[in-house]
A protein has these predicted regions:
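C-terminal outer-membrane beta-barrel translocator/porin domains of Gram-negative envelope proteins
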Residues: 278-460, 464-474, 499, 509-535
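Sec-dependent N-terminal signal peptides
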Residues: 4-14
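Periplasmic polypeptide-binding modules associated with outer-membrane biogenesis and secretion
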Residues: 21-138, 146, 160-189, 203-207, ...
Length: 535
C-alpha cells in the first residue's frame, strides 16, 4: 500500500512539473555530408538557415508541439530537393530545465527546457551534364549539351549553362540554323550587414545568314538588409546587347540600366502556409546607346518607372515526387514610360494549388496520383480600345503558358500578337499519375533509378481580343489539351525530364464554336522536351 501511495505521489509531482514545463530552441548546428568524400563542396550552413530559418524565439507549450514543429521542419528540408531524403535527421538535446519568475495560467512558475538541434543530411546529386535535346514546334529541334547544377558550390543557387544548335524543321516557325551558348548564375555572399547576390547572365548566338552574332551580357548586385519583420532589398543591373532586330533603327548595340528597391513586410504568420508578405516596390529601366535610341524604336523607349505593391503567401510539400500545397500572389503596379507618355496600371493574380493522393500500396507502380492547377489572371486598368498605342504595342505574353497553342500567332492580316493580350485568364490543369519506379542495386544501374509519371493536361486562356474588342468571350478563347511524360531521377531529386505533346483542340475539333475570322493559320499541335516542370 505504501509503495502505491509513493508511486501516486511521484506521478502527480511529475505531471505537475511537466504541465508547467515549456520548450524553446536555443541553438542549431548542421552536419551536411558532401556527395562523396572526394567532393570539395557541400551545402553551406548559412544558406540553409537563411532559406528555412529555425524559430528560436517561439516557446512551445508542450513536447508534443515541439515534435510537430520538428516534423514540419524536416518536411521543409525535403522541399528544398537538395538532400537525399532518407538521410535527413533532426536530433535534439535538452538542457536542464530553467524555472522562470513568469507564472502560467494556473499560477505555477513557467519552466523552460532549452533545446539544441543537430541537423544531419547528405547532399543529393545536383550536377547534370547531359545531352539535352529539345523539340519545340515554335523554334524547331535544338541539339543541346546542357549543364545544370541546382546547388552550385553549396549555395542552393542554380547554375545553368548550355551549348546548342537549333535546326529548323517543317513543323517549326524558324527558317535558319542557329548556334549559341548561355550561362546564368547568381552567387550569394555576405557583404558586411547585407546578404548580397552577384547576378550574372550571358548569352551569345549566331544565326546563319547574319554577318554578326547576337549577344546579351548582364551583371548586377542585389543587397538585402534584414530586420525582424521586414527587409530592404536593393538591386542594380546593367546589360549590354547586340540585337540585329534593331538594325533598321541603328540601335543594334545598346545598354540597359535597371534599379529596383523593395521592402517585404511580414503581416501575419499563416502557420502551415508560412508568412503573409506585403511588398511595396519601385523599379526603373533606362535604355541607351552612344548615338541615342531611335525615337521610332518603341521596344527601347525609356525611361520607364514602375511602382507597385503585392501580397503573397504559399508553400508546397513534396512527397513521392508529387506536390501538395497552395501559393497565392496578388500584384498591382503602375508603370509610366516618359518617352511614349503611356501610363499602364496593371493588376495580376497568380495562384497555384497541388494535391497528391495515395493509390495502391506498391512501390513499383500506380502508388499515387496528383491534381495540379495553375491560375494566372491579369488586366490593364485602362481601356485598350481608347488608346491605339496600347492596342498595338502593350500586353503580356502568354504563349509559353499554353501547351498546344503556337507562341507565334498574330491576328490575321495584322502585326499584332494574338498571345500578348492586355487582359487574360489562363488556367492549367494537370493530372500526374505514377506509372513506374525502378530500384536497381548494381553499381552502375543504381544511378539510373527513376520514377515515371504520365500527366494528362488541359490549358485554357480567355483574353481581351484586340480585333473584336471583347473581354473573355469563350468564342475568342484558346483551348488546348495533351499529355506529358515526366521522369524523376532518384539521385538527382531536383531534376525532372519532361516531354509534352499538346493539341489546339479548339481549332482542330470545334472550329464551328469559335470565332475563326481573326485566327492565324498556324499548326494545331506543339511538342516540347526539356528538363523542368511546366510550373
Amino acid at each position: 500500500m505504501l509503495k502505491k501511495l509513493l508511486f501516486l505521489f511521484l506521478y502527480l509531482a511529475a505531471s505537475c512539473f511537466l504541465y508547467g514545463q515549456q520548450f524553446q530552441i536555443s541553438s542549431v548546428d548542421y552536419e551536411i555530408l558532401p556527395i562523396s568524400p572526394k567532393s570539395h563542396f557541400k551545402t553551406d550552413d548559412y544558406q540553409i538557415a537563411k532559406e528555412i530559418p529555425v524559430n528560436t524565439k517561439k516557446v512551445f507549450s508542450s513536447e508534443e508541439d515541439l515534435f510537430k514543429y520538428l516534423d514540419d521542419y524536416r518536411q521543409k528540408l525535403k522541399n528544398l530537393r537538395a538532400f537525399e531524403e532518407e538521410t535527413i535527421e533532426i536530433n535534439y538535446e535538452y538542457s536542464e530545465p530553467v524555472t522562470t519568475s513568469t507564472l502560467n495560467n494556473q499560477g505555477q512558475p513557467l519552466t523552460i527546457t532549452f533545446v539544441t538541434l543537430h541537423i544531419k543530411a547528405q547532399d543529393a546529386h545536383h550536377l547534370v551534364i547531359i545531352p539535352g535535346p529539345k523539340y519545340n514546334s515554335n523554334s524547331g529541334l535544338t541539339l543541346k549539351i546542357k549543364l545544370k547544377d541546382t546547388n552550385f558550390l553549396g549555395t542552393l543557387q542554380t547554375l545553368r549553362s548550355d551549348f546548342y544548335v537549333m535546326i529548323p524543321t517543317s513543323e517549326s516557325d524558324a527558317d535558319n540554323f542557329e548556334t549559341g551558348i548561355n550561362f546564368a548564375y547568381d552567387y550569394p555572399f555576405q557583404l558586411g550587414i547585407f546578404d548580397a547576390l552577384w547576378i550574372n547572365d550571358l548569352g551569345i548566338s549566331y544565326t546563319s545568314g547574319n554577318n554578326l552574332p547576337e549577344f546579351g551580357i548582364s551583371t548586377g548586385l542585389r543587397l538585402e538588409l534584414p530586420f525582424e519583420k521586414t527587409k530592404l532589398i536593393f538591386e542594380a543591373t546593367q546589360s549590354f546587347a547586340n540585337n540585329l532586330g534593331f538594325q533598321k533603327y541603328n540601335d543594334t548595340f545598346y545598354f540597359t540600366d535597371t534599379f529596383k528597391i523593395s521592402a517585404p513586410i511580414v503581416l501575419a504568420d499563416l502557420n502551415y502556409f508560412g508568412k503573409l508578405n506585403y511588398t511595396p516596390y519601385f523599379n526603373s529601366t533606362f535604355y541607351w546607346d552612344f548615338n541615342g535610341i531611335n525615337k521610332n524604336n518603341i521596344s527601347l523607349a525609356s525611361p520607364i518607372i514602375t511602382g507597385g505593391h503585392s501580397l503573397s503567401f504559399g508553400r508546397k510539400d513534396w512527397n513521392k515526387n508529387l506536390r501538395t500545397g497552395l501559393s497565392v500572389s496578388l500584384d498591382n503596379y503602375y508603370s509610366y514610360n516618359f518617352k511614349t507618355k503611356i501610363f499602364s496600371p496593371v493588376v495580376k493574380l497568380d495562384t497555384q494549388a497541388y494535391k497528391s493522393f495515395d493509390l495502391f500500396d506498391n512501390k513499383y507502380t500506380l502508388n499515387s496520383f496528383g491534381i495540379c492547377a495553375n491560375l494566372n489572371t491579369f488586366t490593364y486598368l485602362t481601356k485598350p480600345s481608347d488608346d491605339p498605342f496600347t492596342l498595338q504595342h502593350q500586353g503580356i505574353g502568354i504563349g509559353g503558358q499554353l501547351r498546344g497553342i503556337r507562341d507565334t500567332q498574330y491576328y490575321e492580316g495584322t502585326g499584332m500578337s494574338a498571345l500578348s493580350p492586355t487582359s487574360a485568364i489562363i488556367l492549367n490543369l494537370d493530372f500526374p499519375i505514377h506509372i513506374l519506379s525502378t530500384y536497381f542495386t548494381k553499381t552502375f544501374l543504381k544511378y539510373l533509378n527513376f520514377d515515371m509519371q504520365l500527366s494528362p493536361f488541359i490549358d485554357i486562356a480567355l483574353c481581351y481580343n484586340k480585333i473584336t474588342k471583347e473581354y473573355f468571350n469563350p468564342k475568342d478563347g484558346f483551348y488546348a489539351a495533351g499529355l506529358e511524360a515526366i521522369v524523376y531521377l532518384h539521385r538527382w531529386s531536383s531534376t525532372a525530364i519532361r516531354g509534352s505533346v499538346g493539341i489546339d483542340v479548339g481549332r482542330k475539333f470545334f472550329p464551328n464554336m469559335l470565332n475563326m475570322e481573326w485566327r492565324d493559320g498556324v499548326s494545331k499541335k506543339e511538342f516540347s522536351l526539356g528538363l523542368e516542370l511546366h510550373y
